[in-house]
């Protein structure tokens, strides 16, 4: 009998958007089945199940659960389905420093099939579990949330920083002589809608993979995150570094690459200044980037691929 695969909605903390909702909602849109979540209702209990697991009993031979998991929260992200069902984890942020913990969890729950959002992370885990079915699906976005904005020459924000801190590469001081908006320095956190509007009104932004912004965690891993798609959809000139996953997927480098090393801060400031002085020259690039992102960024495409892959493995998805 084929096991029926049902996805479970990620846990939502009050006032915080869970990025893992993107693939879950896409799974529903493509006709994937879902199961009711059973998260604990008391906050104190939530904390307990981040650190401790319930025992397994009577694993179902009729159904499997597609769960959306970060290694640091692996126990809670799969709660409590690991007790009764085969878990098919879709895994984000499986950095090298977490390999031992993630591998122990995969072994404990006899995971046979897994999905990773990073090619390099998947390759390391595959070496530890050569018989495991592993699929790599890069991060996507809901393309409808990011509009193309104004032409570059008509935008008000010269340089936008948001998301990860970039101080290890470009320092902490503002770029002088331009309208530099760093969302991390604002007294009030921008809503998603406010950030999307800011992106649609920004000329340039910095994009870096985690191995540059947080090398202690990122190690040598560079991966395609949703931020690249969001910038491409918003037609912002991206300055920094593109992960090879993105270049391979779309067939060209959409980022203005800047040498990162001893003189990174000066390199970035000079490059941004040069781009702003010739901003209209970059309109064709950002137009192409948006066109490519509209075509290749949607979560629906990725989850359809996941669904077909699972069917090919013998699941009822």
Please give the residue ranges for each predicted region:
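A charged, aromatic-enriched C-terminal amphipathic alpha-helix characteristic of glycosyltransferases
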Residues: 276-311
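CheY-like receiver
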Residues: 198, 271-274, 309
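Acidic, glycine-centered active-site loop in nucleotide-sugar glycosyltransferases
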Residues: 248-259, 270
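Short, hydrophobic/aromatic alpha-helical segments in well-folded domains
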Residues: 194, 227, 271, 288-289
């Amino acid at each position: 009998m084929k096991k029926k695969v049902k996805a479970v909605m990620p846990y939502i903390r009050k006032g915080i958007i869970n990025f893992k909702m993107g693939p879950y909602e896409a799974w529903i849109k493509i006709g994937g089945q879902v199961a009711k979540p059973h998260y604990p209702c008391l906050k104190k209990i939530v904390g307990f199940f981040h650190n401790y697991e319930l025992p397994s009993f009577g694993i179902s031979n009729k159904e499997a659960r597609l769960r959306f998991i970060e290694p640091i929260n692996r126990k809670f992200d799969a709660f409590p389905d690991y007790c009764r069902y085969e878990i098919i984890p879709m895994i984000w942020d499986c950095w090298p420093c977490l390999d031992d913990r993630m591998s122990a969890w995969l072994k404990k729950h006899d995971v046979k099939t897994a999905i990773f959002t990073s090619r390099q992370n998947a390759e390391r885990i595959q070496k530890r579990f050569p018989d495991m079915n592993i699929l790599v699906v890069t991060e996507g976005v809901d393309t409808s949330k990011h509009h193309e904005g104004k032409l570059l020459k008509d935008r008000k924000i010269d340089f936008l920083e948001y998301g990860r801190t970039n101080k290890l590469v470009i320092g902490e001081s503002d770029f002088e002589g331009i309208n530099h908006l760093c969302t991390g320095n604002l007294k009030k956190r921008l809503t998603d809608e406010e950030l999307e509007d800011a992106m649609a009104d920004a000329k340039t932004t910095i994009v870096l993979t985690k191995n540059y912004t947080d090398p202690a965690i990122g190690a040598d891993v560079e991966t395609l995150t949703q931020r690249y798609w969001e910038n491409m959809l918003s037609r912002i000139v991206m300055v920094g570094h593109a992960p090879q996953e993105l270049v391979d997927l779309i067939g060209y480098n959409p980022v203005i690459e800047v040498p990162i090393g001893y003189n990174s801060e000066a390199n970035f400031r000079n490059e941004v200044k040069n781009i702003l002085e010739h901003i209209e020259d970059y309109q064709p690039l950002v137009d192409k980037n948006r066109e490519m992102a509209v075509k290749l960024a949607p979560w629906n495409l990725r989850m359809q691929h996941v669904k077909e892959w699972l069917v090919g493995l013998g699941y009822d998805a």
